[in-house]
């Protein structure tokens, strides 16, 4: 659990450093398969809220869930998550 939290925090910090306004940016891509295999967006939102995040917006981008939020530390982030596993997805630098 602690390792997952540390990895998640590192991803969030990296996302914060590389994020600026984006839509269909290609910053992240997910081999997510058919939408019938995707987990509900609400499940991701609930998991993030349980971590203390304040969700501003969630949308689809590059086959991933793209989340705009404020973390439990008050940091604004743009983060990507795989829609089947809900795992954080690394992003490409612009």
Predicted region positions:
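Classic N-terminal secretory signal peptides
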Residues: 1-24
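Sequence contexts marking disulfide-bonded cysteines in secreted/extracellular proteins
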Residues: 29-31, 63-65
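Short, non-transmembrane alpha-helical segments in secretory-pathway proteins
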Residues: 31-54
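Extracytoplasmic
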Residues: 50-53, 62-64, 74-76
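Short beta-strand
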Residues: 57-59
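Conserved histidines in hydrophobic membrane contexts and catalytic metal-binding motifs
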Residues: 67-70, 81, 86
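Residue-level signal for well-ordered, solvent-exposed loop/turn and beta-edge residues enriched
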Residues: 75, 86-87
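A short, surface-exposed interaction/processing loop segment used at functional sites
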Residues: 87-94
């Amino acid at each position: 659990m602690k390792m997952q939290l540390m990895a998640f925090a590192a991803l969030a910090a990296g996302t914060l450093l590389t994020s600026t306004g984006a839509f269909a940016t290609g910053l992240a891509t997910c081999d997510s398969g058919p939408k019938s295999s995707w987990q509900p967006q609400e499940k991701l939102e609930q998991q993030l809220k349980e971590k203390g995040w304040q969700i501003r917006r969630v949308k689809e981008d590059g086959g991933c869930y793209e989340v705009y939020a404020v973390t439990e530390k008050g940091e604004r982030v743009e983060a990507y998550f795989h829609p089947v596993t809900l795992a954080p997805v690394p992003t490409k630098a612009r």
